[in-house]
Amino acid sequence: MNLIYNFSAGPAMIPKDVLYQAKKELQNWNQIGCSIMEISHRSKEFIQVALEAEQDLRDLLNISNSYEILFCQGGARGQFAAVPMNLLGNFKETDYINSGYWSNCALIEAKKYCIPKNISVRQKKNGKSFLLKPSQWNISDNSAYIHYCPNETIDGMSIYEEPNFKNKIIVGDFSSFILSRRINIENYGLIYAGAQKNIGPSGITIILIRKDLIGYASKISPSIFNYYIISKYNSMFNTPPTFSWYLSGLVFKWLKKQGGIKKIEQLNQKKSNLLYQIIDNSNFYINDIDKRNRSQMNVVFHLYNSKLDNLFLKEAKNAGLNALKGHNVIGGMRASIYNAMPLEGVQSLAKFMLYFEKKYG
């Protein structure tokens, strides 16, 4: 079988070593005679898996004991509702940094529970789109929290400077950003992330929340979205997606073996630079995003002639390069190169892009 590289935006590629281990253990995990999918989430065996996953994540991101780690369900969209239901307190107003598709989705959902201020930070200059720095955000004085999304997977744009507004609670949708680079957790009140991009398979959502922010859920909050209840029951108030939890734990161990987040960050920079260098040296491929806001995780580009799009995708697939079609919202191409994508995969795509341009440019 020829080698296939999967550039899907999510569910996304999982490290091959992790898949091999899961395959090896699938029918007889830890020599107990059955799959980990078949054992109770309250068994001592699975509780050990959960504890190790939490500790490995703490080690990777340097998360102090002043933060709770919750393993939940419902994805990022579930958190679009859960965040205001848990963090509003006596406030009615919130600040939502609108940088693209997903941050706008969070804003729309929040309108059901609070009065979100739409703070648009996307601008254009000399034909290039860019995002305002946190110091330029028009933050309210009386908002319960500030919500933002540091990486917009559809738009291919990122905010790399971490916000720091002293006593303001910062909430981050890190679904496509978590574990890709070093961050200062202490800057945030809450971080949430769907697993299916940089963590593991879909089905589990990870929340990092400052402990002093737990316990203020509104009365309308469903129990499974109430952070206090989730915390009280150690993320097992209802039956969790045990296989997703287990596989996420394997990914955490894999990341540690790679040298941790510092090494991963360096590799991610190298991978994205390969593709952006080809785009910048070409009139065939187009990316209209300012260099300071280009996503390292999701490299978006258009062909100079959109009539070549289907041919590009067809020939790319024949070359073992899958899932490069851009989101329907903006079209074009998108190469999602999360942590699991090896450098060799990006090099193969770069080589193909040069070939395709030479043939059809």
From Swiss-Prot:
Location of this chain's protein in the cell: Cytoplasm
Keyword Transferase tagged: yes
Catalytic activity: O-phospho-L-serine + 2-oxoglutarate = 3-phosphooxypyruvate + L-glutamate; 4-(phosphooxy)-L-threonine + 2-oxoglutarate = (R)-3-hydroxy-2-oxo-4-phosphooxybutanoate + L-glutamate
InterPro entries for this protein: Aminotrans_V_dom (IPR000192), Aminotrans_V_PyrdxlP_BS (IPR020578), Pser_aminoTfrase (IPR022278), PyrdxlP-dep_Trfase (IPR015424), PyrdxlP-dep_Trfase_major (IPR015421), PyrdxlP-dep_Trfase_small (IPR015422)
Names of required cofactors: pyridoxal 5'-phosphate
Modified residue annotations for N6-(pyridoxal phosphate)lysine: K197
Pathway: Amino-acid biosynthesis; L-serine biosynthesis; L-serine from 3-phospho-D-glycerate: step 2/3; Cofactor biosynthesis; pyridoxine 5'-phosphate biosynthesis; pyridoxine 5'-phosphate from D-erythrose 4-phosphate: step 3/5
Annotated residues for binding of L-glutamate: R42
EC top class named in words: transferase
Annotated GO MF terms: O-phospho-L-serine:2-oxoglutarate aminotransferase activity; pyridoxal phosphate binding
GO terms for cellular component: cytoplasm
EC number per UniProt: 2.6.1.52
Cofactor details (free text): Binds 1 pyridoxal phosphate per subunit.
Binding site for pyridoxal 5'-phosphate: A76, R77, W102, T153, D173, Q196, N238, T239
GO biological processes: L-serine biosynthetic process; pyridoxine biosynthetic process
Keywords: Amino-acid biosynthesis, Aminotransferase, Cytoplasm, Pyridoxal phosphate, Pyridoxine biosynthesis, Serine biosynthesis, Transferase
Domain of life: Bacteria
Description of how the protein assembles with itself and partners: Homodimer.
Family in the record: Belongs to the class-V pyridoxal-phosphate-dependent aminotransferase family. SerC subfamily.
Function per UniProt: Catalyzes the reversible conversion of 3-phosphohydroxypyruvate to phosphoserine and of 3-hydroxy-2-oxo-4-phosphonooxybutanoate to phosphohydroxythreonine.
Name of the protein: Phosphoserine aminotransferase
Organism of provenance: Buchnera aphidicola subsp. Schizaphis graminum (strain Sg)
Gene that encodes it: serC
